[in-house]
Swiss-Prot record:
Pfam families registered for this protein in UniProt: Glycos_transf_4
Top EC class for this record: transferase
Ranges that cross the membrane: 12-32, 58-78, 84-104, 120-140, 151-171, 177-197, 200-220, 229-250, 303-323
Lineage: Bacteria, Bacillati, Bacillota, Clostridia, Eubacteriales
Protein name as catalogued: Phospho-N-acetylmuramoyl-pentapeptide-transferase
Keywords for the protein's UniProt record, in alphabetical order: Cell cycle, Cell division, Cell membrane, Cell shape, Cell wall biogenesis/degradation, Magnesium, Membrane, Metal-binding, Peptidoglycan synthesis, Transferase, Transmembrane, Transmembrane helix
CDD domains (UniProt xref): GT_MraY (cd06852)
Family as reported in the entry's similarity comment: Belongs to the glycosyltransferase 4 family. MraY subfamily.
Organism of provenance: Clostridium perfringens (strain SM101 / Type A)
GO molecular function terms attached to this record: metal ion binding; phospho-N-acetylmuramoyl-pentapeptide-transferase activity; UDP-N-acetylmuramoyl-L-alanyl-D-glutamyl-meso-2,6-diaminopimelyl-D-alanyl-D-alanine:undecaprenyl-phosphate transferase activity
Reactions listed under catalytic activity: UDP-N-acetyl-alpha-D-muramoyl-L-alanyl-gamma-D-glutamyl-meso-2,6-diaminopimeloyl-D-alanyl-D-alanine + di-trans,octa-cis-undecaprenyl phosphate = di-trans,octa-cis-undecaprenyl diphospho-N-acetyl-alpha-D-muramoyl-L-alanyl-D-glutamyl-meso-2,6-diaminopimeloyl-D-alanyl-D-alanine + UMP
Catalytic activity, EC: 2.7.8.13
Functional description taken from the UniProt entry: Catalyzes the initial step of the lipid cycle reactions in the biosynthesis of the cell wall peptidoglycan: transfers peptidoglycan precursor phospho-MurNAc-pentapeptide from UDP-MurNAc-pentapeptide onto the lipid carrier undecaprenyl phosphate, yielding undecaprenyl-pyrophosphoryl-MurNAc-pentapeptide, known as lipid I.
Topology within the bilayer: Multi-pass membrane protein
Name of the coding gene: mraY
Residues in coiled coil: none
Amino acid sequence: MEILKSMIDPKIVMAIVISFIVASILGPIIIPLLHKLKFGQNIRQEGPKSHLKKAGTPTIGGLIFIFATIITMFVMVGNPTDEAMIALYSFVGFGFVGFLDDLLKIIKKKNEGLTSGQKMILLLIISGFLTWYAYKYIGTSINIPFLNGQINLGLFYIPAAMFYFAGVTNAVNLTDGLDGLATSVTVLVTTFLGIISYNLGHISLAIFCVALAGALLAFLRFNAFPARVFMGDTGSLALGGAVAMVALILKMPLILVLIGIIYVIETLSVILQVASFKLTGKRIFKMAPIHHHFEQLGWSETKIVSVFSIITVVFCFIAFASL
């Protein structure tokens, strides 16, 4: 009943509707502009051959749901709480790193923007600043799923949170490898976080979450197979920053292991693939991240996105049961 109550609250419904409408309006404006600026995606040659035909598809489309979410936030919440603003800073801050990465790829005309070292340094700097700023409001404790308890990280909180942000943002980035995949999964993740935020009394934070979910639903119209636009690192890092910060504010970073199970699986598949090849010279998967493995098995992009979304729904219910 609490879940239903949160979803029929007029403010929540309006936030979803407004962000959906704003993103739907921005899409047909921003996508042609990206075409005109020749902000086309460069495709990795070592990736699936079926993806080569996607070369030139506009990227940096994450600006659509970033702007839509920001506009909706300030329309619905004239004076957002500090917690909601911290989530917004994380959303925009990590998105800015992604924007720099995308811009360099476009300038270089190849799928190489910031080096992995440069990107990691920027992610750690932003996460360090945000965590230091946020912990004054949220403390240093985190909840343990299923155990109904907390653990206080004390002095380890800030360094642990910094690497947590780097991990989550990179995980969402890895998930953004198929048309509509990261978008579909993150709609579900942000909806879950919005419901929990509402039920815990964080109304401004809940509005941020559902505004992002509504904007992503609209973006999915342009990003689903065959994609008319890609979110780029601009979008994927922004999404990672948003879900990571909201979960941290709620003292539930560990819950992302459940609701973000696809992010976890995608990341583990890459780690296992690299480790196996270096240690044995053999690959576990036909290609990593794992969504490409299923492509190589003959699954369509639409089927993979559907199955991964269903898995996310199942694990969201498991996460509800753990609270």
